[in-house]
């Protein structure tokens, strides 16, 4: 059975990527679930794959949380991908987290291996909490906090988040 090796790269932060292998008989729903797991995405938003650029190219259908939707049951082998083919993957249609997806290689299945699987990922480059830096501490930041009125962004650790107002927009940092 053929195994497809894809590289999935965050469109706006190219230093964040994963390489995922998937069997030809598995589906875009299976692929979507592995991407969600590997990037730490929740299971509460729609996603979709597009051949070429997102929104303006051939889409394969939306994938709902839990693996349902028009695009979920499309088998990898039926999409006729060739090495070098490029897709765009969108997670969360509102926020539009866009990743570039490139087919790197088509190889043979390894016995005893469970697919899909992450075979490689970027080296983690930690960002550090800005509040802790001011206190002379070095604590890994886990949240991007956006202050709308000041139009500023701050990266904070878990303990410093306890002192932030509830109506502030905060998202987890993906490493």
Task: Give short role names for the model-derived ranges.
Residues 1-175:
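Short linear regulatory motifs enriched in tryptophan with gly/pro/ser
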């Amino acid at each position: 059975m053929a195994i497809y090796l894809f590289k999935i790269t965050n469109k706006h932060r190219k230093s964040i990527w994963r390489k995922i292998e998937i069997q030809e008989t598995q589906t875009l729903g299976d692929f979507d679930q592995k991407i969600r797991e590997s990037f730490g995405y929740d299971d509460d938003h729609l996603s979709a794959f597009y051949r070429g650029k997102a929104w303006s190219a051939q889409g394969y259908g939306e994938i709902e949380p839990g693996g349902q939707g028009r695009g979920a049951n499309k088998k990898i082998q039926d999409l006729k991908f060739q090495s070098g083919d490029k897709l765009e993957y969108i997670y969360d249609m509102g926020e539009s987290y866009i990743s570039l997806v490139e087919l790197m290689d088509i190889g043979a299945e390894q016995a005893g291996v469970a697919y899909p699987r992450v075979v490689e990922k970027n080296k983690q480059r930690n960002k550090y909490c800005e509040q802790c830096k001011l206190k002379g501490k070095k604590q890994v930041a886990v949240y991007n906090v956006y202050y709308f009125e000041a139009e500023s962004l701050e990266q904070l650790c878990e303990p410093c988040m306890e002192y932030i107002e509830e109506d502030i927009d905060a998202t987890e940092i993906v490493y």
